From Swiss-Prot:
<dbReference type="GO" id="GO:0036211">
    <property type="term" value="P:protein modification process"/>
</dbReference>
<keyword id="KW-0808">Transferase</keyword>
<dbReference type="InterPro" id="IPR000682">
    <property type="entry name" value="PCMT"/>
</dbReference>
<keyword id="KW-0489">Methyltransferase</keyword>
<dbReference type="GO" id="GO:0032259">
    <property type="term" value="P:methylation"/>
</dbReference>
<dbReference type="Pfam" id="PF01135">
    <property type="entry name" value="PCMT"/>
</dbReference>
<keyword id="KW-0963">Cytoplasm</keyword>
<dbReference type="GO" id="GO:0004719">
    <property type="term" value="F:protein-L-isoaspartate (D-aspartate) O-methyltransferase activity"/>
</dbReference>
<dbReference type="InterPro" id="IPR029063">
    <property type="entry name" value="SAM-dependent_MTases_sf"/>
</dbReference>
<keyword id="KW-0949">S-adenosyl-L-methionine</keyword>
<feature type="active site">
    <location>
        <position position="66"/>
    </location>
</feature>
<comment type="similarity">
    <text>Belongs to the methyltransferase superfamily. L-isoaspartyl/D-aspartyl protein methyltransferase family.</text>
</comment>
<protein>
    <recommendedName>
        <fullName>Protein-L-isoaspartate O-methyltransferase</fullName>
        <ecNumber>2.1.1.77</ecNumber>
    </recommendedName>
</protein>
<comment type="function">
    <text>Catalyzes the methyl esterification of L-isoaspartyl residues in peptides and proteins that result from spontaneous decomposition of normal L-aspartyl and L-asparaginyl residues. It plays a role in the repair and/or degradation of damaged proteins.</text>
</comment>
<dbReference type="GO" id="GO:0005737">
    <property type="term" value="C:cytoplasm"/>
</dbReference>
<dbReference type="GO" id="GO:0030091">
    <property type="term" value="P:protein repair"/>
</dbReference>
Length: 216
């Protein structure tokens, strides 16, 4: 199951990594992490043959598993120039795919998901992969996870109209935050916590599901 056959085989997975290289992902540690995680484990069985396409796929409950390029791009922004992501918070764990990639690059991942059924899927997937350095919590991601902060890296998998203040408060000095922002047109925001304050760089146009409050 982990190695896959046919459209989920190692060869198919290797082609996905080559596509990421062609699209501009240069960080070898990020590419290695993407190659290490079997994406087909995280998608519905009916979609397994599409698991290594560079596209977002539906998870149910109005949510998606993110496009591999976008996952790699966001993690590369967090990692570049560092040997590790350090203590990392993921907002919007979904089925756990991105958390599993993050877990290849640090020993300390905290991931929150507001939808209980998706969180249970993520927990089951972590058990399948024996990925024991991911702590999953049912929580409102806009509030972060203050009891576990501050964080060296924060990554958000849903777009709000603004940057949630709680996430800035939980970003450690020297920390990095990457998230989509925008209620209509969205862009990728990269924020660094410098001695002079928070410095934001606006990057690629993106499309994510909305960042919602509360839990279900």
């Amino acid at each position: 199951m982990l190695h896959g056959i046919g459209m989920t085989s190692q060869r198919t997975r290797a082609r996905m990594i080559e596509r990421l290289r062609e699209k501009g992902i240069r960080n070898e540690a990020v590419l290695k992490a993407m190659a290490a995680v079997p994406r087909h484990v995280f998608v519905e069985e009916a979609l397994a043959s599409r698991a290594y396409e560079d596209t977002a796929l539906p998870l149910g409950m109005g949510q998606t598993i993110s496009q591999p390029f976008v996952v790699a791009r966001m993690i590369e922004l967090l990692l570049n120039g560092r040997s590790s992501l350090g203590k990392t918070l993921e907002v919007g764990a979904g089925c756990g795919y991105q958390a599993a990639v993050l877990a290849q690059l640090t020993k300390d991942v905290y991931a929150v998901e507001r939808l209980g059924p998706l969180l249970e899927k993520a927990k089951a997937n972590m058990r399948i992969l024996q990925q024991f350095n991911v702590r999953l919590k049912h929580a409102d991601g806009q509030l972060g996870l203050p009891e576990a902060g501050p964080f060296d890296s924060i990554i958000v998998a849903a777009a709000g109209s603004h940057v949630p203040p709680a996430l800035l408060e939980q970003l450690a000095p020297g920390g990095r935050l990457v998230l989509p922002v925008g209620a209509g047109e969205q862009y990728l925001s990269f924020i660094e916590h410098t001695p002079q304050g928070y410095v934001e760089t606006r990057l690629d146009a993106v499309r994510f599901v909305p960042l919602l409050s509360g839990t279900q």
